[in-house]
């Protein structure tokens, strides 16, 4: 039996920290962009009744791996990523890279990374900028194992 190890390193957050702040209406309005064929989502948006929306129905291979994966799609810059530590804890973060690996959409400062995380989180939650800043770890360093 072999074991793999990997690093989750950068600026980011534990996705579980935002779960209780998810706004069903915001999330249900976001999901049709990702699943245009889902009639139930379209009906929710048209009727304005979001009571039956369960975001977790779209996790674990049903579109997304987990909440951190959803947040990656909320980031319109395609520069943030997600990782799982092997024990089910998912992180949404920006991994550091060398300047010669940067693409044109790379953030130039730590503040720009934080702003991108805030914007993505606010797309599906009711959290304020200050609330999000409190849960962002500027020195995220987790060893995954599986």
Protein language model regions, located:
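Acidic (Asp/Glu-rich) sequence patches and key acidic residues
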Residues: 1-126, 130, 134, 146
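Glycine-rich, aromatic-bearing surface loops/beta-hairpins
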Residues: 138-141
